[in-house]
From Swiss-Prot:
It comes from Odontoglossum ringspot virus (isolate Japan). This is Movement protein. It comes from the Viruses. Pfam families: MP. InterPro entries: TMV_movement, Viral_movement.
Length: 303
């Protein structure tokens, strides 16, 4: 009876097999990652599957590895390995977990400095996303970096991240590996970059709720955007500047092409002089606005 029950349990809970080989350290590293240490998830984001989270999706990359053979190396690293990205969208590198292991005997001297680099940035201080220092006597170490910034999917596919290792004081023959590093990243992928803005505020407005969808909602959002204030200041300065479309050149009135042609042909009945947008015809008592002049001087009232 006991054997029969044991067989039934095995059929209900089959043993899971892994389709691709991976090291023990990689398994331990992936199982030790807690997304809550890097980002705060709402209750719906924790419970709903990724297909129902339209705005963003949290994903963990596969393990990528670097083997250091030299004292100073700058290596490309795939922090989005196995991560399904959104086409024409964005990816936020929320966090990075790094595990290293010294391939040395115990009580060896020396140490290493590890730095995560964004190779798009030209200034060294801006390209450095985080660094870590440890000694060789610490056989295995783990640390995390929280870059917490977003890039476009197109940029991310170009492999923009690197890892710089600087090993010092380790006496080893060339051609051997003193240090191994493994990386796992936590990413947030999403299609729209507007996560906390006007769109979300309007969508959250409900009938009878505390916020009404009025013009004040839009004005409140626009006032919080710094560029809106800069644009307002820029336009106010330009309005104070004198217009370049003056009717006088060197103190003389400027005739449009049609009136100039009539004047040169000696047609005095239709000769017209233009003074401050007021057109006066010879022998005509009324004041008219010339169509060509009006269309030439009209200023657009749209910004």
């Amino acid at each position: 009876m006991g054997r029969l029950r044991f067989v039934v349990l095995l059929s209900i809970f089959p043993i899971k097999t892994f389709s691709e080989p991976c090291s023990t350290m990689a398994l331990v590293l992936r199982d030790s990652i807690k997304i809550s240490e890097f980002i705060n998830l709402s209750a719906s984001e924790k419970l709903l599957p990724s297909a129902l989270t339209a705005v963003k999706s949290v994903r963990i990359s596969k393990v990528d590895k670097i083997i250091s053979y030299e004292n100073d190396t700058l290596s490309d690293i795939d922090l989005l390995k196995g991560v399904k990205l959104v086409e024409n969208g964005y990816v936020c590198l929320a966090g990075l977990v790094v595990t290293g292991e010294w391939n040395l005997p115990d009580n060896c001297k020396g140490g290493v400095s590890i730095c995560l680099v964004d190779k798009r940035m030209k200034r060294a201080n801006e390209a450095t996303l985080g660094s870590y220092h440890t000694s060789a006597c610490k056989k295995r170490f783990t640390f995390k970096i929280i870059p917490n910034y977003s890039v476009t999917t197109a940029d991310a596919l170009k492999g923009i991240w690197q890892v710089m290792t600087n090993i010092r004081g380790v006496e080893m023959e060339k051609g051997f590996c003193p240090l191994s590093l493994e990386f796992v990243s936590i990413c947030v992928v999403y299609l729209n970059n507007i996560k906390l803005g006007l769109r979300e505020k309007i969508l959250n407005v409900t009938e009878g709720g505390p916020t009404e969808l009025t013009e004040a909602v839009v004005d409140e959002f626009v006032e919080k955007v710094p560029m809106a204030a800069r644009l307002k200041s820029f336009r106010s300065v330009n309005k104070k500047k004198p217009s370049n479309s003056s009717k006088f050149v060197n103190g003389k009135s400027r005739l449009n092409s049609r009136n100039k042609l009539n004047y040169e042909n000696g047609d005095s009945d239709v000769g017209i002089s233009v003074v401050d947008d007021i057109v006066v015809g010879n022998g005509v008592s009324d004041i008219r606005i010339d169509d060509d002049c009006e269309s030439f001087d009209a200023q657009s009232d749209s910004y």
